[in-house]
A protein has these predicted regions:
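Active-site-proximal loop->helix
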Residues: 93, 101-164, 260-270, 381-389
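Alpha-helix C-terminal capping segments
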Residues: 79-89, 103-115, 136-137, 234-244, ...
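Claisen-condensing/thiolase-fold acyl-transfer catalytic domains that form or cleave C-C bonds
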Residues: 224-232, 324-388
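Active-site/ligand-binding loops adjacent to catalytic centers
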Residues: 24-26, 156-194, 202, 214, ...
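A short, small-residue-rich loop immediately preceding and capping a beta-strand
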Residues: 76, 87-123, 216-230, 250-251, ...
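Buried hydrophobic positions in well-ordered alpha/beta secondary-structure cores of metabolic enzymes
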Residues: 42, 61, 73, 80, ...
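Positively charged, low-complexity intrinsically disordered leader regions
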Residues: 1-89
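Active-site nucleophile and cofactor-binding loops and adjacent substrate-binding regions
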Residues: 63-76, 92-101, 192-195, 221-226, ...
Length: 415
């Protein structure tokens, strides 16, 4: 795949970032100006949580929920909107799971006078009406996916009229529309190299903030669906390690119901269900795999970012998977100690941090743990209501469906 192959979907500036070999790229002034609304985001030491857990570990968290959209997603949405506006693009199509990315792109589009059309995974569209309202408040249109507005969506609905959707399906719908018009581009909220690069502002700030605290992490943790917030916090620390700095453990925490890194295959696959994207080598459950519905909609993606996947293959990244109930349990423990309600996605990182803290307690080690609290859960209270009512289900993926999806991987995957 060359730059010209991606030109129907992305501005050339982002395509060149995708293939860049530069260590650093300057953040444009207009993007920096918008970042100033919430960046640098705060880092806290979770002393009350440490006390509640009675752990010798020191726990720090970087809080990305202070952004106007409530998550880390505007870090790349603003940059992508800027480069698209610079290229004369009038409309952006995109997908969203839980609505965090759609909200961020809607927010960014408003700043650069770009129309935004969001395909929201149907199960989240139904679960999170206030996320839809937030997108519409910023001027975006929001459509439940799969929809009858695209050929990709209609094909899915023909097979399964009750389909709850997936990020892979929503991507297909957004890509299909973007490819049809010269004034329209597609925008992706995770997975791609340039998206991960934009998010490293998180970890770059975290390194400076740890210096201010006179500390440095032994373990760096982030939740992982497509890999953008995990790489945002972890990659700068991994980079320091590769350049001779302190060795860390980087732990990506994924949902047990959609475990691309802990259960998937490292192979070439499509990034979407409709097979409209280029093939990418990544940890994948198969592009035709539809995960069961669960509340961390932003983590319901069949694949993992190629860079995160490669880092895991090199032994630079570890992966852990948890069901949603223990993640909500961890989130409530965190909220009652630190006063912040984590998003269901971020709750996976909280769970990972608590597991590491309890390991330190068992082993009598005073390690330093840093995790990325990627967003707040103010629009996800229905999920917490289910948790408190005891009706939250830990759904397992269908083993037969997974095997079938892996068997359908493109032939190149076997090479």
């Amino acid at each position: 795949v060359g730059p010209d192959d991606l030109a129907p979907l992305f501005p050339m500036s982002l395509i060149m970032q995708e293939v860049s070999g530069e260590r650093y790229l300057e953040i444009p002034g207009p993007v920096r100006d918008i970042y100033k609304q919430w960046r640098p985001s705060p880092m806290f030491r979770a002393r009350r949580l440490e006390k509640a857990l009675d752990t010798p570990a020191k726990i720090y968290y970087k809080y990305e929920g202070v952004s106007p959209a409530g998550s880390h997603k505007p870090n790349t949405a603003v940059a992508q909107a800027f480069y698209n506006a610079e290229a004369g693009i009038k409309k952006i199509t995109t997908e969203t799971g839980a609505g965090q990315w759609g909200s961020a792109m809607a927010f960014a589009g408003a700043f650069f006078d770009i129309e935004v059309q969001v395909f929201m995974v149907k199960v989240s569209f139904q679960q999170k009406p206030y996320r839809r309202a937030l997108m519409e408040s910023f001027g975006a249109t929001c459509i439940a996916s799969p929809s009858d507005t695209t050929q990709s969506g209609r094909a899915i609905l023909e097979k399964d009229p009750d389909s709850t959707g997936s990020l892979g399906i929503a991507i297909s719908e957004a890509v299909e529309l973007a490819a049809q018009r010269d004034d329209t581009n597609y925008s992706l909220g995770s997975v791609l190299n340039h998206v991960l690069m934009h998010q490293t502002v998180i970890g770059q700030e975290a390194i400076k903030q740890m210096e201010m605290a006179g500390d440095y992490p032994d373990v760096v943790i982030g939740c992982a669906g497509g890999g953008s917030n995990f790489s945002g916090i972890a990659f700068p620390f991994i980079g320091e390690q590769l350049r001779g700095g302190k060795k860390i453990r980087a732990v990506a925490v994924e949902p047990a119901a959609c475990p691309s890194m802990t259960r998937g295959k490292y192979a070439y696959d499509f990034g979407d269900t409709g097979n409209l994207t280029p093939l990418t080598k990544m940890h994948t459950l198969g592009s035709s795999f539809i995960p069961p519905g669960f509340h961390a909609g932003g983590l319901r993606y069949h694949g993992m970012a190629p860079l995160v996947s490669h880092a895991k293959e090199l032994g630079l990244v570890e992966a852990a998977a948890y069901h949603q109930t223990p993640c909500f349990e961890a989130a409530v423990t965190f909220a009652r100690s630190e006063g912040i309600i984590p998003a269901p996605e971020s709750a996976h990182a909280v769970k990972g941090a608590l597991e590491e803290a309890m390991r330190c307690k068992r082993e009598g080690k005073s390690e330093t743990i840093l995790f990325n609290l990627s967003g707040h859960g103010h629009f996800d209270m229905a999920a917490y209501t289910e948790y408190f009512a005891g009706t939250l289900e830990d759904k397992n993926y269908d083993e037969q469906a997974l095997s079938s999806a892996l068997e359908k991987l493109p032939p190149v995957a076997a090479s």
